[in-house]
């Protein structure tokens, strides 16, 4: 693939303010590519993990119902590649639509578009390139998964605008970010049913939990420029709402597992799978007990910890599938 055109000479080459210092993009990527990789959030991989993990949940739970197959290894790898590419394309789209807002927020004004490192046209070309490669991965899956992958474009397209018209943009993020639970289930089974739908709803509740924490970083700037979020909506009641999302995450995931595995699964397989919501719930409780919604550094640290929480749940589901 021909690399995108170099960023304008007048662009600011510095890293994005909320990226980890010394990340691989800053250290290893060719200078011409850094603004594009920053657009894709390659310097902040936690978002890719949060997009990928529901895919692995869906695949592992599907495999636990009828046994894993060698083809599942490709589905898992294909989901990883697709998550990296589509998270990059989605973030590029988000930055294109939000560039005027981002220029007014301290945490985001150093991003490539508002800082002038990349032009809107260059960003659009980069977005199309990422989506095109992701499509090549998608077409290796079965027909049901391909249709679901195409349908996923709708919530991805709508999400950046949600903060303009609703106090619940995190719901739209959850709809988009957890779509992989449906897609990966369909890639294994060839269809859908109640178990993946319940798992999908569990993922949406999880997203409401972690992205409300994330949104507390920007609540003061968001109030000044009129951006809506659950962090602003909940205010001092954030802890109670997060507790509700925690309970919903655990109960819906447990319901998905029971719907998928009963009555045929062995007790050991069932108990091992149920360790997934149990472990995830304990981690979310740990986050809730340590949350200081007025400390951006704490909010960012807790948000990032959801990668580990989600992966532990995925490991329990994968172990149940391998029994």
Language-model features, listed with the residues they occupy:
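Small-residue-rich segments of transmembrane alpha-helices in multi-pass membrane proteins
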Residues: 49-59, 173-188, 233-236, 240, ...
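Helix-loop junctions at the membrane-solvent interface of multi-pass transporters
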Residues: 60, 64, 139-141, 162, ...
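Cytosolic, membrane-interface loops and tails of multi-pass inner-membrane proteins
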Residues: 9-36, 91-118, 212-235, 288-298
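Multi-pass membrane catalytic core of lipid/isoprenoid biosynthesis enzymes
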Residues: 76-83, 99-149, 224-273, 308, ...
């Amino acid at each position: 693939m021909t690399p995108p055109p170099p960023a304008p000479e007048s662009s600011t080459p510095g890293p994005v303010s909320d990226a980890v210092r010394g990340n691989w993009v800053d250290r290893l990527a060719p200078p011409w590519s850094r603004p594009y990789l920053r657009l894709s959030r390659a310097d902040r991989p936690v978002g890719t993990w949060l997009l990928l993990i529901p895919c692995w949940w869906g695949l592992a739970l599907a495999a636990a119902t009828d046994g894993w197959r060698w083809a599942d290894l490709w589905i898992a790898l294909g989901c990883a590649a697709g998550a990296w590419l589509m998270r990059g394309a989605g973030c590029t789209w988000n930055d294109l639509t939000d560039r005027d807002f981002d220029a007014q927020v301290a945490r985001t004004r150093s991003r490539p578009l508002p800082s002038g490192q990349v032009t809107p046209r260059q960003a659009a070309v980069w977005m199309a390139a990422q989506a095109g490669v992701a499509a090549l991965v998608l077409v290796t899956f079965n027909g049901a998964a391909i249709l679901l992958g195409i349908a996923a474009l709708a919530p991805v397209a709508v999400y950046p605008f949600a903060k303009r018209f609703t106090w619940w943009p995190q719901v739209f993020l959850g709809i988009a970010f957890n779509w992989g639970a449906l897609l990966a289930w369909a890639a294994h089974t060839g269809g859908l049913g109640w178990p993946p739908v319940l798992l999908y709803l569990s993922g949406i509740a999880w997203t409401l939990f972690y992205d409300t924490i994330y949104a507390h970083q920007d609540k003061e700037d968001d109030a000044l420029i009129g951006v809506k979020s659950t962090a602003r909506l909940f205010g001092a009641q954030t802890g109670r709402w997060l507790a509700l999302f925690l309970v919903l995450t655990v109960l819906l995931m447990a319901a998905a597992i029971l719907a998928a595995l009963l009555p045929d699964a062995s007790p050991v397989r069932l108990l091992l799978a149920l360790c997934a919501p149990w472990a995830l719930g304990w981690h979310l409780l740990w986050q809730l007990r340590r949350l200081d919604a007025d400390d951006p550094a704490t909010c960012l640290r807790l948000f990032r910890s959801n990668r580990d929480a989600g992966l532990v749940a995925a490991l329990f589901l994968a172990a149940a599938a391998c029994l």
